[in-house]
């Protein structure tokens, strides 16, 4: 298993990025300014884009695993890689996600706790309704973890 920083042609992973953020113009808002990493285990299995938020906060803007490899620990391994490589520079790792029964428990298992909510984020910022597990995402839930 290798963790590789992607510095050029990040859009080659667009299909994977769109699994976590299904509107391309929203991905474009952070892709160029963010640092991108992929987890390669006999092929790319997972990607993550992080940005410098402010005040010692590093934010996961996008993390996604190839569907057939989900549930095998790749995203968790990539999060731990980020934590281990950025703990000297940042105090907090933060992630914003929809209030979904799939994503919230995953992040909580990775040591994140709920921090705050941005009401109506998905309805105000996306040009179409976003659904996960049959539930329309409305609010953005931010979770944080000390690193």
Residue spans for each PLM region:
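Conserved N-terminal entry element of GNAT/NAT acetyltransferase domains
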Residues: 1-9, 141, 147
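Short hydrophobic/aromatic beta-strand or adjacent loop that forms the aromatic wall/cage
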Residues: 34-36, 137-142
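Conserved catalytic-core motifs of GNAT/GCN5-like acyltransferases
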Residues: 94-96, 108, 113-134
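Conserved GNAT acetyl-CoA-binding A-motif
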Residues: 85-99
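Acetyl-CoA-dependent GNAT
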Residues: 4-67, 79
């Amino acid at each position: 298993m290798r963790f590789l920083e992607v510095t050029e042609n990040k859009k080659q992973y667009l299909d994977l990025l769109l699994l976590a953020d299904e509107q391309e113009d929203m991905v474009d808002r952070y892709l160029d300014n963010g640092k991108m990493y992929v987890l390669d285990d006999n092929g790319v299995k997972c990607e993550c884009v992080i940005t410098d938020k402010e005040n010692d906060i590093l934010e996961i803007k996008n993390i996604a695993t190839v569907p057939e490899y989900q549930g095998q620990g790749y995203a968790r391994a990539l999060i731990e890689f980020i934590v281990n490589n950025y703990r000297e520079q940042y105090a907090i790792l933060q992630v914003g996600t929809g209030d979904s029964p799939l994503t919230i428990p995953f992040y909580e298992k990775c040591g994140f706790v709920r921090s705050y909510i941005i009401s109506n984020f998905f309805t105000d910022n996306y040009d179409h309704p976003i659904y996960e597990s049959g539930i329309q995402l409305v609010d953005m839930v931010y979770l944080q973890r000390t690193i």
